[in-house]
Swiss-Prot record:
PROSITE patterns: MPN (PS50249). A motif (JAMM motif) lies at residues 411-424. Its main location: membrane. GO terms for cellular component: cytoplasm; membrane. InterPro entries: JAMM/MPN+_dom, MPN, STAMBP/STALP-like_MPN, USP8_dimer. Zinc metalloprotease that cleaves 'Lys-48'- and 'Lys-63'-linked polyubiquitin chains. This is AMSH-like ubiquitin thioesterase 1. Zn(2+) 2 binds at residues 426, 469, 475, 477. It is an enzyme of class 3 (hydrolase). Its EC number is 3.4.19.-. Pfam families: JAB, USP8_dimer.
């Protein structure tokens, strides 16, 4: 982890994630699955800080967000039990990781150690290290240097920050449906942050996890039980380019087998129940079009800068009054230089007929960088100004079978200019909820000024606008409260000439 930071606010990562009931419950289970997949990779790579952040995010999602969904009460009991058991494993691992994370931070920045302020803040239960300044580190728990404080993320747009008004984790346990009212000593014992914050003296765990990087391997993801079906019809898979980032073999999340943890786990298990969700707004699910396609000509391993647009760069905006709650940029995303041309060849027939074509982008995570290693062409229905996948479950099954992260979508504008329509931003909203790094690529072959664009919704501005919009079809959107744009051109995306990708045609 050769990185730097100005402020580490790990506790902020556990801030409550609000529920959008237009999005199906199974989608939230997939978000949980993706968080655990990232945690597995960070664990295998011995990246304890990002691992800690991912586990905190999962605990918040499992304790608060998922049980608050309006469909949770009627969901399968097996899914609830699976979630509860994974949560127990995660909470146990978090307790063990606290001293390891503190030690790692001290090792990385020994000269800055006197400047840390490692303590639990009584007002909000957060834990912060202040003013440890080093340049240009993009991490979930490391704020960008020299950025003004940023707005709070309305959803999952930032890895290091969720909602401002988050109660302490102890308070979250009190809100759960528990079998008994634990005393303060018990609450302190089971707090994720612990009675003494990260500086508390727990014995660090010993991991036997090994990591290898073969050139080409398929491995199964952590999957919610109800989504374990395989694809019935075999998709056509072709090789799209040359080199591929090696995929790590990762071990699943490990629950402690030590006897000292047995009583802790049993007591914590008795406290956890998901039967008291908070009241939520009963909005109907709004079905927006599924993932679409794009083109690009960029130099080797340089940021994929699109031609000038009025939107500023695709960065998470930072303007929070509280310095400890700054948000961070997404991780780097690498795209094969030839991928957009490959997609346009696949879309050629539709483009000639003035019909849009869409594709889904998926890939892998290695050394804190995402790589798009698969271009999935789903069964779809198209018009001159829209494109919608017709079998979303088939797409999910392909991603799960190959342990791929959902990294966005690509689609054509056969005769229109290069921009994100109102339908496009609604489509991309679900991708960016799933993963902040997800991008929307628009291919506009008839646009002489820019024939492609790589976009993300702004956070929190654009994400909040779309989250609060219940309209369908083409319509106007109001500007975000901060006066900024709804979406931006991305600048953390790199075109990689050595990256290999597969084309998976499901049509």
């Amino acid at each position: 982890m050769g990185s730097s930071f100005e402020t580490i606010d790990i506790a902020t990562s556990a801030r409550r994630i609000g529920v959008d009931n237009r999005i199906s419950l199974k989608f939230y289970f997939r978000i949980a699955d993706n968080i655990l997949k990232q945690a597995n990779i960070f664990r295998a790579e011995k990246n304890v800080i990002d691992l800690y952040v991912m586990l905190l995010r999962f605990s918040s999602l499992a304790l608060e967000t998922i049980p608050s969904h309006r469909d949770y009460r009627t969901s399968l009991k097996s899914n609830k039990e699976y979630l509860r058991m994974r949560l127990l494993d995660v909470l146990t691992e978090l307790e063990k990781l606290k001293p390891v994370v503190q030690q790692r931070i001290d090792e990385l920045y020994p000269k800055l150690k006197p400047r840390y302020n490692v303590q639990a803040h009584p007002a909000n239960g957060s834990l912060g290290w202040s003013s440890a300044v080093k340049p240009s580190f993009n991490s979930y728990d490391h704020a960008k240097v020299r950025n003004p404080p940023g707005h709070n993320s309305g959803y999952m747009g930032s890895r290091g920050q969720q909602f401002l008004n988050a109660a302490p984790l102890e308070e979250r346990f009190r809100k759960m449906s528990v079998n008994f009212r634990p005393n303060e000593e018990t609450l302190s014992k089971h707090s994720i942050l612990g009675p003494g914050g990260l500086s508390a003296q727990w014995q660090p765990p010993k991991y036997d996890t090994k990591v290898q990087y073969p050139s080409n391997i398929d491995f199964s993801p952590v999957v919610i039980p109800s989504f374990q079906q395989l694809v019935d019809s075999k998709p056509m898979i072709t090789n799209g380019s040359n080199d591929e980032p090696e995929k790590p073999i990762v071990e699943p999340s490990v629950a402690s087998n030590e006897k000292i943890q047995k009583n802790y786990t049993e007591e914590l298990s008795s406290m956890i129940s998901f039967e008291e969700p908070e009241s939520v707004n009963e909005n109907n699910l709004i079905r927006q079009p599924s993932p679409p396609p794009v083109l690009a000509e960029v130099q080797d391993l340089v940021p994929a800068l699109c031609p000038e647009v009025r939107e500023p760069e695709c960065m998470i905006e930072n303007s929070l009054p509280d310095e400890s709650l700054r948000s961070e940029s997404p991780l780097e995303l690498h795209i094969a230089t030839s991928m957009m041309d490959t997609f346009m060849r696949l879309a050629k027939s539709n483009t000639k007929k003035n019909l849009e074509t869409c594709g889904i982008l998926a890939g892998s995570l290695k050394n804190r960088k995402f790589y798009i290693t698969a271009l999935i062409i789903p069964k779809q229905e198209s018009t001159s100004d829209s494109c919608q996948a017709t079998n979303e479950e088939e797409i999910f099954e392909v991603q799960d079978k190959q342990s791929l992260f959902p990294l966005g979508w690509i689609h054509t504008h056969p005769t229109q200019s290069c921009f994100m329509s109102s339908i496009d931003v609604h489509t991309h909203y679900s991708y960016q909820i799933m993963l902040p790094e997800a991008v929307a690529i628009v291919m506009a072959p008839q646009d002489s000024s820019r024939n492609h664009g790589i976009f993300r919704l702004t956070t929190p501005g654009g994400m909040t606008v779309i989250r609060n919009c219940d309209r369908r079809g083409f319509h106007a959107h109001s500007s975000p409260e901060d006066g900024g744009p709804i979406y931006n051109t991305c600048k953390e995306v790199y075109m990689n000439p050595n990256l290999k990708f597969d084309v998976i045609d499901l049509r």
